[in-house]
Amino acid sequence: MLFKSLQSITSVNSIQKNQISSISVGSTQSNNNAALLDAAALVVIPGLLTAAAVAHI
């Protein structure tokens, strides 16, 4: 059980790293508001996935 939860946390962490790199690329675009909204969505969604994974265990 613990190992399964650690696996899910590790996978979420790697997803977040990939998303952070895409956020930094997106923030160079002219529309900063859209980039900020994307960044907020990319932070919230993995958090929801983590909560769902923990609840599922």
UniProtKB/Swiss-Prot annotation:
Its main location: membrane. The chain crosses the membrane at residues 34-54. The lineage of its organism: Eukaryota, Amoebozoa, Evosea, Eumycetozoa, Dictyostelia. GO terms for cellular component: membrane. This is Uncharacterized protein DDB_G0283501. It comes from the Eukaryota. Keywords: Membrane, Transmembrane, Transmembrane helix. It is found in: Membrane. It comes from Dictyostelium discoideum (Social amoeba). It is a single-pass membrane protein.
